[in-house]
């Protein structure tokens, strides 16, 4: 072999190794952030996100703070940006607290999406949304109304915090629907469990003790709903209607024992999966506009809606909402069909 030919082969080999290295480095990395870890609802969403990552050959990292805090989420966002992640999908604990960190991420070319709980729309590109506030707030009231069969009733709201975006939007719509359609219902209290199982149980027991003639607890939160059910069992209160949002695996024993007649949610595994599919499409094909559709394996087709479906005034190119195809009412007849 001549020296010239040897140098040529060596050069081609080096270029090939460099190309392989570049391809490895170019693999998409997507961060999927819950409000906090250790809660079944968020774990299920993370499972859906990671399932999508496998289907798309994308590296999906699921991580969140141990307590729901702006500082904890901001630290994770900054870490993922500094590590070179291509997209961040976050369930926001605050509508505006994450905005400075998310805007910095977007300025550095990172695709920013929200899921489950939104930020202000200018702080992200797309929100993967389980349902509009009107849909979910109405769902809460309708579930309660099917059990509270009287014109005058006492109702309590119980959920995670006074600042979390999604739940406060639903509750606002639910209270408006009560005022319009059930004017005889009195909302006697609105209390919070702050995503803590022990505090949630204590708060729920406190509500039931303080309002012994309570007709319904509306608990649109994955910790608050099972806490309300457990509190009713602990206090042997079988007269209060308990409705809200949580996962079927958590609520199954309460439904089977009859403590909870029905509750609602959406397929959070699908929500996680849809979130990653949308992020992947953005990274590979660029921004989507209102009306654009995306086919998702095992789910079907989703569509980009304007921010106005969530009640926002803000609209911009490359910005919108992707609604989940459906929401689910769980009861004793159908809960066995679901495992998440």
UniProtKB/Swiss-Prot annotation:
Superkingdom of origin: Bacteria
Gene Ontology CC terms, in alphabetical order: ATP-binding cassette (ABC) transporter complex; outer membrane-bounded periplasmic space
Main location: periplasm
GO MF term list: carbohydrate binding
Location within or outside the cell: Periplasm
InterPro entries: Bact_Solute-Bind_Prot2, LsrB, Peripla_BP_I, SBP_2_dom
SUPFAM superfamilies: Periplasmic binding protein-like I (SSF53822)
One Pfam family per UniProt: Peripla_BP_4
Signal peptide extent: 1-26
Presence of the UniProt keyword Signal in the record: yes
Keyword Electron transport assigned: no
Gene Ontology BP terms: transmembrane transport
UniProt keyword annotations, A-Z: Periplasm, Signal
Family: Belongs to the bacterial solute-binding protein 2 family.
Assembly description: The complex is composed of two ATP-binding proteins (LsrA), two transmembrane proteins (LsrC and LsrD) and a solute-binding protein (LsrB).
NCBIfam families: PRK15408.1
Summary of the function given for this chain in its UniProt record: Part of the ABC transporter complex LsrABCD involved in autoinducer 2 (AI-2) import. Binds AI-2 and delivers it to the LsrC and LsrD permeases.
Record protein name field: Autoinducer 2-binding protein LsrB
Organism: Escherichia coli O139:H28 (strain E24377A / ETEC)
